[in-house]
Every structure is written in C-alpha cells, then in structure tokens.
Amino acid sequence: KARQLKTSILRKLGRKEEALALVAESLQIDRFNMGCRFEHYLLTRDVKVLEEMKELMRGWAHGYIEYALDFAAAGLYEEALSLLECHVTGTTEIYPVVYYAMGYFHTCKGDESKALEYYQRAEKENHSYCFPNRIEEVLILQDALRLNIHGAKAAYSLGNFWYANRQYDNAIACWEHSAAINPAYPTVWRNLSLAYYNKRDDKQKALETLEKAYALDEHDSRILMELDQLYKRLGRPHSERLAFLEAHLPEVEQRDDLSIERITLYNQSGRYAEAKELIAARNFHPWEGGEGKITGQYVLCRVELAKIALSEKRYADALVLLDETDACPFNL
C-alpha cells in the first residue's frame, strides 16, 4: 500500500521515470501488488499492462474494491473510480458494493447527482450474496441512504453488516427501514424474523415476518425449512406441520433436512410404513450437524413396525424388520 501511494505521488509530481522504477521494484517483491500494477497502467496507458492486471484479478469484485479504497484513502478518487470502472467494463453481473463505492467516491468529489446515479444502479443489482464486511462500507451505505430515499437494498445490506458485527438493534432498524421502502423483498422479512426470535424473543413478530417472507416466495425451500423449524419451536401440532409440508412437496424434495422432517412427522404420527417407504425412495447426503437424523428414523420405523408385527403374532416379519436395523443401506 505504501509503495502504491509513493508511486501515485511520484506520478502526480510528473516524475514518471522514478515512478516506473518503483513499480518495477515493487513487482519484484510482490507480483500481486495490484495497486502498483494499476499505477503502471496509469503511467504508460499500455493496454497489455491493464489486461495482465485484470487477468490476475480474475474479475474478483472484492479485490477491486479493496484497492480502490486504498486510492480513495489518499484522496485519489478519480483513480479509485477508474479502477472500479475496469472491473465493471465487460462484467455482466456487478457486485452491488462496486456501484455503491463508485457512488460514494463521486460524493467525495462533490458530485452528488452522479453519486445518486450509481446508488440507483446498485439497487438494481442482485443482492442475494451482498454481505458488506469493511468498516468503510458503513460510510458508503450510509451515504447511499442519505442520497437515495428509495434505497431499500442499501438499508438491507447495511443491516447485514450490523448483524454480522453484533449490532443487533442497528441491524433490525435497517431491515425495518428496508422493508418499509420495499415490502416485496422476502429476504429482508426472513432476516427480521431471525432477529426478532433470536435477539428480542418476540415470537409473534418472528412468526408474522417469516410467514410473510414465505408468502412472497413460496419456491424458496430454505425459507420453507426455516418456517417449519419455527412452527416446531412454537409447538405447532404434527398434523398441521405435515399438512403444510405436503402442500409444498416440490420444495420439500429439494432438501434433505425437509425430507427428514416429513419422515419424522410420519413416524411421530404413527404412520411407520409410509415413513419406511419415503426413506427407501431417496438418496440422503449427511451434513455437519445432521449426523444420525435419518438413520435414527430408519431404525425407529422398523422397531415400531416390528412391535406391531409382534402384537399381531407375525413373528417372522418382526425378525426381518429388526434384522434390517443391524446395518444402514447405502442411500442413507
């Protein structure tokens, strides 16, 4: 970072040869000093230099943001913008913080109308995996909210930052603000539900917001899983939970955890033969934290069916069922 800054200063002073020498020396030490590589391009305007830098950067938005922040920290907003523009050019799906950062750099330059334009662009990008984690991004997103009163996604993203950093009241305030601007975004309601339940012990609000999230996107199998888990924690009757899951079978069948919950509910309802059939019909994939869940249901349904067989004096059937509990089949 210091070498990039010194190179920038030399370039600004018109001492091009010294700047180029420092770039060469710096790249001998660290070939991945992208700040110096970009300075090399600014000094020479050699497209090959730029293309080599872009190849090494692999289109990784976070790398571009990091080096752009280095330039911006020195007041080199034009250079920061130019670097991010290199990433944007030719990229089809832009990580939203790239546009938010470009907007903020325009604010720092005193051009708030241009800043607003970039903030509005950022709102249109996919925020599914937008999780800001730099302290500078707080200032960036706060400025986006200041200039763009319709910035629902900026509020949502800032809430993600606050929640990850245990500032739960700030996170909830941001998500509530986001939901007020755009009540049609399911993920913000889902996030609010988790915060209400886990951080405020407000079970009613948690239920209302998660049901709203699922109503907005009934094809989201993850939200379905979380809603069923909430129903479970709140003591929803087995019959209601099972009916709810079976009303959304395509989504249930996308996930092992939901499929296991359905099987468990069959066993808990005494429908052991149906549970046994469902277990045999699916290939399960154990996950961390889920060890033993499906194998437990596999054993349970057979033991209970064996008890029924014994009560009906079908001793051979009972022995077959109990023998099957000695080892689990490969589909589990």
Regions found by a protein language model. Name each.
Residues R11, A72, T107, Y163, ...:
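Position-specific recognition of the canonical hydrophobic site in helix A of tetratricopeptide repeat
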Residues A24-Q28, E55, C86-G90, E123-K124, ...:
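Conserved structural position within tetratricopeptide repeats
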Residues R31, R58-G59, T92-E93, H127, ...:
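Short coil turns that delineate tetratricopeptide repeat
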Residues S8, L42, L69, Y104, ...:
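Residue-level recognition of tetratricopeptide repeat
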Residues A19, A80, A115, E137, ...:
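Single-residue signature of alpha-solenoid repeat helices
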